[in-house]
Amino acid sequence: DSLAGFSEFEVPVSYPDANLGRQLSGLAALLAAGMPLHCVSMSADGSYDTHSDQVAEFDGSLKLTCDAILAFQRDLESRGLQDRVLVELWSEFGRRPEENDTGTDHGAAGAAFITGSRATGEMVGEFPGLTTLDEDDNLRHTSDFREMYCSLLEQWLGQDAGPIIPGAGSLGRPKLVRS
């Protein structure tokens, strides 16, 4: 309670009682206090490595993550900071479409989401379908994840992606951020 007198540390919205919710609440307070942050990394609660019991594990984990991010967005909006933050959600691996009893194995293709008041909300790539899997029974990629990083570096952080992303010169730049 020693921070109770500082308005930036008062939480104006209710966050889920989970690690990600507490981390995002603290991040909102740091931003409200004027901390000059440009990039922060956090891990979501729950298990997304669903080789078994996928429906229950994935649904519960995804709900916790979505509820925490929604609370964070509402918190930023209440503090007038919504245009200062962009959130990228991603996994380092996808899932294969075929079930192995009650779950799925690691796969090559996955999804990423960009959220925030300045995110365009555009879908990049196309759903590859379930009838044209690759030779290892993975979903086929329909976009290169490096394009997303090039776009975020240039459109959000104002940095040239060339020195950071190998082969950036030959990659597209989907519009991910509104001016």
Label for each model-derived stretch:
Residues 1-179:
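Ligand-binding pockets and gating/stacking loops
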